[in-house]
Regions:
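N-terminal regulatory/effector-sensing and dimerization cores
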Residues: 40-137
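Short, charged N-terminal helix-start/capping segments
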Residues: 1-14, 50-58, 90-108, 151-168
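A short, N-terminal "cap"/entry segment at the start of jelly-roll beta-barrel domains
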Residues: 1-44, 48-51, 57-58, 140-147
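Amphipathic alpha-helical segments enriched in hydrophobic/aromatic residues interleaved with Lys/Arg
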Residues: 4-20, 126-183, 187-188, 193-201
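N-proximal short alpha-helices
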Residues: 23, 33-37, 41-44, 59, ...
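A general structural-boundary detector
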Residues: 37, 55, 77, 106, ...
Length: 202
């Protein structure tokens, strides 16, 4: 019986992963259609920046504010000091302080461009959500790294997709964008990156 349960769980995880990947590709295509040939677009949605590259890039340094970064298509690498990170569309990463990073796009082409998003995180919103949700206290020693990587779940991706889809309904952005961003932050707080995000509010 235990084997059957394990097989069922693995099958469900595989179905969820396949669904997320297909949905990501569809969302990446919509973003490419909206932003055209621009490599970086500060969108009409507050705090949201979209990225698109048609070819790999050289390492480039810049300052990243407290944010969550998600790749919808492609592969990128980030360096901070002696630490290197490589992540793709199955994961996201979070920073809680301003960080001087070196970023490089590793996989991108005209037919399958690199597509990603950066959502700046708001300190006051996080603090209020921590109070409202009554999340358990942090364990000491957690969230010690400057960058935390997390697995992208179906509910979290669903919220991200709803946020980006608001670009097609600009009249809805002022009302719905704050609500969807609040959901995204709440779902991030309940992931393995929750301790890192809580640091923003302290």
């Amino acid at each position: 019986m235990a084997v059957d349960v394990l097989a069922s769980e693995e099958s469900e995880e595989s179905i969820t992963a396949d669904w997320i990947m297909k949905s990501m590709k569809a969302l990446a295509s919509r973003i490419v259609g909206q932003i055209g040939d621009e490599t970086e677009v500060v969108s009409e949605i507050p705090n949201l920046t979209l990225h698109r590259f048609d070819e790999p890039t050289k390492p480039t340094g810049y300052l990243l504010e407290p944010s969550v970064c998600v790749i919808l298509q492609g592969l990128s690498a980030w360096s901070l000091g002696d630490n290197d990170y490589v992540y793709d569309a199955t994961r996201f990463f979070v920073t809680s302080i301003d960080l001087p990073l070196i970023a490089q796009i590793l996989e991108a082409s005209p037919s399958e461009p690199y597509v990603g998003m950066t959502l700046k995180l708001d300190r006051m919103q996080i603090a209020q959500l921590i109070l409202d949700s009554q999340l358990p206290s942090l364990n000491s020693g957690k969230a010690s790294r400057a960058i935390e990587l997390g697995a992208l779940s179906k509910p979290l991706f669903g919220a991200i997709e709803r946020l980006i889809n608001l670009l097609a309904e600009p009249e809805c952005i002022p009302v719905l964008s704050p609500l969807v961003q609040k959901e995204i932050v709440f779902r991030l707080l309940t992931t393995e990156c929750g301790p890192k995000i809580r640091q923003i509010a302290t």
